[in-house]
Amino acid sequence: MIKGIGLDMIDLERVKQVLEKNPRFIERVLTEKEIKQFEKYEGSRKIEFLAGRFAAKEAYAKANGTGFGKHLSFTDVEILQVEDGRPHVTMPIKSGETVFVSITHTARSAAAQVIIEI
């Protein structure tokens, strides 16, 4: 049974501008393991990665029905690439839940969809 579906989209230029003004934005959005993956990339691919993770985490919060705030922050949600390159939510996963995530990019935006199944 589906618990929730979340969808989010973000403009790459917006993420680039935020990152230029506040380099610590990375630490507010990404976990330590995600930062290690982020640091492997260069140039525009870094912005795509960060924007994709931001959108995926927003989509997760929507699918979870909580949004971000008092009980959930960006760094509470971790999305890592598995060996075949797919994104995989590694935390938080509640017992009995399966989380599906898809991230995509265009030249101007990143989007993500999350489905939580119980």
From Swiss-Prot:
Name the residues that bind Mg(2+): D8, E58
Which Enzyme Commission number(s) are on file for it?
2.7.8.7
Q: What class of enzyme is it?
A: transferase
Record field: transmembrane: none
Organism's domain of life?
Answer: Bacteria
Location of this chain's protein in the cell: Cytoplasm
Biological process (GO) annotations held by this record are: fatty acid biosynthetic process
Cofactor(s) this protein requires:
Mg(2+)
Specify one Pfam family. Answer: ACPS
What's the catalysed reaction? apo-[ACP] + CoA = holo-[ACP] + adenosine 3',5'-bisphosphate + H(+)
Q: One GO molecular-function annotation for this sequence? A: magnesium ion binding
Instruction: Provide GO CC annotations from the record.
Output: cytoplasm
Keyword annotations:
Cytoplasm, Fatty acid biosynthesis, Fatty acid metabolism, Lipid biosynthesis, Lipid metabolism, Magnesium, Metal-binding, Transferase
Q: Which HAMAP family match?
A: AcpS (MF_00101)
| Family, per entry | Belongs to the P-Pant transferase superfamily. AcpS family.
According to its UniProt entry, the function of this protein is described as: Transfers the 4'-phosphopantetheine moiety from coenzyme A to a Ser of acyl-carrier-protein.
Question: What is the name of the protein in this document?
Answer: Holo-[acyl-carrier-protein] synthase
What is this protein's gene name?
Answer: acpS
